[in-house]
Amino acid sequence: MGHAIEEVALSRGHEVVGRIDKGQEVKISPLTDAVIDFSTPDSAYDNIRLALEGGFPVVSGTTGWTERMSEIREMVERQEGAFFYSSNFSVGVFLFRHLVREAAKLMNNLPQYSDVEMEEVHHIHKLDYPSGTALTVAGDILSEMDRYSDTKAYLGDDERPSVAKDQLLIHSLREGEVPGIHRVALGSAQDVIRLEHEAFGREGFAMGAVMATEFLQGKKGCFGMEDMLHFD
């Protein structure tokens, strides 16, 4: 992601004053106006914390660490900092989420459409599963459908697990160099409705991350895609 973000940033007239790769010590140039973090689940929290403690606005798209999000929010409030987080910076994914949420809202009043399942496909280098985007979309569904209150995930060719009536099943696949595919199936005994978003590359994610960085300038607090795009 770093190379894609750098290309987009340069194309929009920005200067990249530092690059930190995996295993390198985190040193942030005083010339920095914002830090963009796309790292790993085990390093993201410390990266974000160090940047915020240094007084730098932070944009993060790293997934798999958000059980500590409350600590980051408290730090942002305490230091009057700025933090923008999204599990997926694609504008198309945000549109997809909006469509899924509206479909779930409609189907909550149609008991025959009570069967919802999800599938996400990513490249073999993605360490966490289900994807952060899949969990976010699942949260959208849970917020609109009374039937569901929890999720259950399984990976690849593992045996399909049994699920409780209130559990939304997510199937995660890791294949080749797939940038990202998310599918939602809403079914009845008579038919099924499928919604899908497929990314063709990393450019859309990179553009969203740079847009978020631009949006964050001069602001204080915690923000997400809904704050920047105002689709609701």
Name each model feature, range by range.
Residues 2-32, 112-232:
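C-terminal substrate-binding/catalytic lobe of Rossmann-fold NAD(P)-dependent oxidoreductases
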Residues 41-42, 64-65, 88-89, 175:
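Short glycine-rich anion-binding loops that position phosphate/pyrophosphate groups of nucleotides
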Residues 29-46, 56-60:
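Rossmann-like NAD(P)-binding element
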Residues 46-49, 53, 62-86, 94-105:
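Rossmann-fold NAD(P)-binding glycine/threonine-rich loop
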Residues 41, 45, 97, 203:
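Glycine-rich phosphate-binding loop at the start of an alpha helix
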Residues 90-91, 104, 123-127:
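Short beta-strand and adjoining strand-loop segment in the mid-core
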Residues 16, 58-59, 82-83:
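Hydrophobic beta-strand scaffold residues
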